[in-house]
Amino acid sequence: MVSMFWLLATFAYLLGSLSFAILLSRLSGSPDPRASGSGNAGATNMLRLAGKKLAVLTLLGDLCKGLIPVVLAGAWGLDPSQQGWIGVCAVLGHLFPLYFRFRGGKGVATAAGVLLGLYPPAAALAIAAWLLTLYLTRTSSLAALIATPLTLPLLAWQEPHALLPMSVLTLLIVWRHRGNLRDLLAGRERHF
């Protein structure tokens, strides 16, 4: 199973490196999301820059980048910890995409896909918390910063073997939002 783990981890990183925001912006003639709007290659910035249709396609593509490798790992009999680490590889691909000079997004939708494949109730909790926080604050980054760590107690209770990789995933997302944290504290963060 070790060789299958490494094969799937590599596949997850390479799949995660496909940036749907960048690809769709190029295909549609929209601005590069890394250089426009919030500067993030993700669905929220695509909504600002290119509209709902491309934002939804970006969201679905990014979600599948996390979901597919985790589901494959489960189908091949890898344990929840290994599935979690494979999911982390998919998110690392999104954050640091090989194909786009290692300049990617913040990993929230890809992480949601990982959770969906690993433990769907945790994904449902994260999505509900994200939507509620976005509705109340109109701030996508704050929604991500609240929703992502909120899943950890549920995972500790129901999928304890996946807790370490999912904690690493949470730290990666919080780290990737460090600029947003500064802007939130200074009152400069973008709202919808």
UniProtKB/Swiss-Prot annotation:
SMART domains: G3P_acyltransf
UniProt KW keywords: Cell inner membrane, Cell membrane, Lipid biosynthesis, Lipid metabolism, Membrane, Phospholipid biosynthesis, Phospholipid metabolism, Transferase, Transmembrane, Transmembrane helix
Record has Lipid metabolism as a keyword: yes
Keyword Transferase: yes
Cellular component aspect of the GO annotation: plasma membrane
Coiled coil: none
GO molecular function: acyl-phosphate glycerol-3-phosphate acyltransferase activity
Oligomer status and interactors: Probably interacts with PlsX.
Protein name: Glycerol-3-phosphate acyltransferase
Gene: plsY
